[in-house]
Amino acid sequence: LGRFSDACVYGRASRLGRVVRPRPELPGDDWVRVEVLLCGICGSDLGNVSYKSSPAMEPFGSFPAILGHEILGRVAEVGPGVVHVAPGDRVVIDPMLHCEVRGWEEKAWCPSCVAGLHSTCELSGEEGAPAGDAHPMRDADGHVAADRGPGVGLELGRPLAPGLTIGYHRDLAGGWGEEMIAHRRQVFTVPHDVPDRVAVLTEPLSIGVHGVLRSGALRSPGPILVIGSGAIAFGTIWALRTLGYEGRLVAQAKRPHEVELAAALGADETITPGDEARQALIDTGARAYMPVVGPEVYAGGGFDLVFDCVGNQPSLAQSIGFATARGQIVVLGCAGQIRKLDLTFLWAKELRLQGYVGYGAEEWEGRRVHTFEVALARMRDDPRALGGLVTHVYPLEQYRDALRSAYDHRRSGAVKVALQP
C-alpha cells in the first residue's frame, strides 16, 4: 500500500510497529550480544516498507523481522569463542548471514563464501543448520548432498530461517531495537577516534569501497561520473579519493546541500541533472544528435566509468548515454524492475555493465582484508566531510518521524537518518 499512500509507510496505516521482546540470548560460543548505539535507515528499508522494491528478493528474507542493518553498537556480552572484542568495545556489524554464520562447517560452504564474497551467499534461501543436520545443498538431480557434512548448529531449537541479512530476518533482529546478537565474524571494532555519527556509516561506505576496489576504478584514466545523492553515492566519491583515484571526478546531485557535500568529499566538479549534466558531457568531447523520434543521443567523448548509485530508469538511461565507447557502468543502486529502458547504446558502444552488492574480501595494500576493515581505517585517517552525512538522529520511539524524514528527504533535507535507542 506504500505505493499509493505515504501514510502506509510512516503513518498509522503502516504495518510497522514497536514490539517488546526478551533480551536476546547467545545461541552459541561464537556469538556476541550488542547494545545498539545508532542504526541508519537505508534506502532498501524504505523500498521494502513502501513495497516499491522488486519482489525478486523475497525468498531471501524471512518475516516478521526487526529492521536495521547499518548498525553501530557496544559489546554487552561475548561467548567463549570470541576473543577479538570484549564488553564495552564499540563495534559495527556486517549484516550478511553467510554460510559460517548460518552454522555450516567450512567444507559445506557455498562457492561465494569460500571465496570470501559472502554478500552473494548461494545458500541464503535455505534454512540454517541445527547441530548435526545434513546440508541443504542439492545436486543436479535434486538430491541432498549429504556428504557436505553436518552443521555446527545454533541453539535455537529449530533451523535458522532463510535470509540474506540481519534486518530482514525472522530469527536475528536488526538494529532498530535496543539489543541484538551477531556472529563473531560479523563484528568489527571501531577505532577510538572515529565518532559515532561517522562510524554508523561503515556499512553504506563499505558498499562504495567494495564497488571502487572491485571495478578497477583506481586504474581508470577518467573522467569518472558518480550519479546519486544518497549515502552510497557520497561513499563512492569518498572511496575514490581516499583510496587513491587522482583523475577527474564529476558528481551529479540535485539539491544545494548535496552538491556541497559531493564537493567536500572530493568531486572536482558538481552538476545537477538536466542542462548542467548535458554540458558536462559535451565538455568531454561528446557530440549531440537528435533522432527523428526519441531523446537526444551522443557519440564521442563521455565518461570512462559511471557509478550509478540510484538504479532507476532515468539514472540507468543517463549512465548508458554518458559512458564513453567501451566504457564501464557500475550499478551500486538497488535497481529492480526497469520499464522502458533503451539498451541500444549498451551494445552500440560496447559498454560493460557491472553490478556490485555489499562487501567481502578485498585485496588492499598487499593484504586480503574485509571491506569493513578498509573503510574503518580510511574513516579514521581521512574523515573529510563524512560527519555531515548523518543529518537527522531520532530516538527509537520516534521511528515514524524518522521514516518521514528519510522518505520525504526532498522536504526534510535528509541525507542519512539514524535511530538511537
What do these predicted regions represent?
Residues 22-39, 54-115, 147, 191-193:
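Glycine-rich beta-strand-centered segment in the early N-terminal region that forms part
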Residues 58-60, 98-227:
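NAD(P)H dinucleotide-binding glycine-rich loop of Rossmann-like/cofactor-binding domains
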Residues 223-229, 241-314:
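Adenosine-nucleotide cofactor-binding segment
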Residues 282, 287-296, 300, 339-391, ...:
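C-terminal substrate-binding/catalytic core of Rossmann-like NAD(P)-dependent dehydrogenases/reductases
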Residues 323-324:
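Helix-to-beta-strand junctions that scaffold the AdoMet/dcAdoMet cofactor pocket
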